[in-house]
Regions:
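Histidine-centered catalytic micro-motifs
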Residues: 91-99
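Short glycine/proline-enriched loop/turn "hinge" motifs that connect secondary-structure elements
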Residues: 43-45, 85
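A short, structural micro-pattern
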Residues: 17, 46-47
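Loop/turn elements at helix/coil->beta-strand transitions in domains of secreted/extracellular proteins
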Residues: 49, 88-91
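Short Gly/aromatic-enriched secondary-structure transition segments
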Residues: 36-43
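Short, contiguous, well-structured surface segments enriched in hydrophobic/aromatic residues
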Residues: 49-56
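Divalent-metal-activated hydrolytic enzyme cores
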Residues: 1-35, 56-77, 81-87, 101-172
């Protein structure tokens, strides 16, 4: 409902959008101040040039389709919807990060999650990122998106700064 008294705030929108990427990253509130400038500066994507998919666990949601089928289906459905609605999207940027609350929650809720070789709680970029790249390639390659993987790591002992490393994942 609009305010008829003239106090309605009005915000700018893009009349047409032709995004070139979908960027999947974590909703952890501690890290939002790092994600936004990383996407703009290092990925070269301004608002309207990408579709943000912000979910707990970020790209990690793609890592375990057998153990977390509902979460995987949610992400797969989003990629398919985006592909249909925005054929201009050519890139899928998948971001994971150190000290993920989502991973800790899974370790507490799913027995064996931390001890199972396929789904250990991981802290090195290549580990889960290779798995995510392989799953993306196996289940979503038909969309024709170029996958780019990044891992956020804390850059100081206070955990107040984050750096993002490009991960060259190995898929089998």
């Amino acid at each position: 409902m609009s305010d008829m008294g003239g106090n309605t705030n009005v915000y700018e929108v893009l009349p047409q959008a032709h995004p070139e990427a979908v960027v999947v990253y974590c909703g952890d509130p501690r890290l939002q101040t790092a994600f936004e400038p990383f996407i703009a500066r290092e990925l070269g994507l301004r608002k309207g040039q990408f579709i943000p998919v912000v979910v707990g666990g970020g790209a990690g949601v793609l890592a375990n389709p057998e153990r977390l089928p509902k979460e995987f289906k949610f992400m797969k459905d989003r990629f398919e919807l985006i592909h249909r609605a925005f054929p201009s999207v050519q890139r899928a940027v998948l971001i994971n990060h150190e000290d993920c609350i989502y991973y800790r929650m899974l370790a507490e809720k799913i027995p064996g999650f931390v001890t199972d070789d396929m789904s250990k709680l991981r802290h090195r970029p290549g580990d889960d990122m290779d798995l995510i790249a392989g799953i993306f390639d196996r289940y979503l390659s038909y969309l024709g998106l170029k996958a780019e993987l990044y891992y956020g790591r804390f850059a100081d002992v206070e955990h107040s700064k984050m750096a993002f490393d490009r991960v060259l994942a190995v898929t089998s």
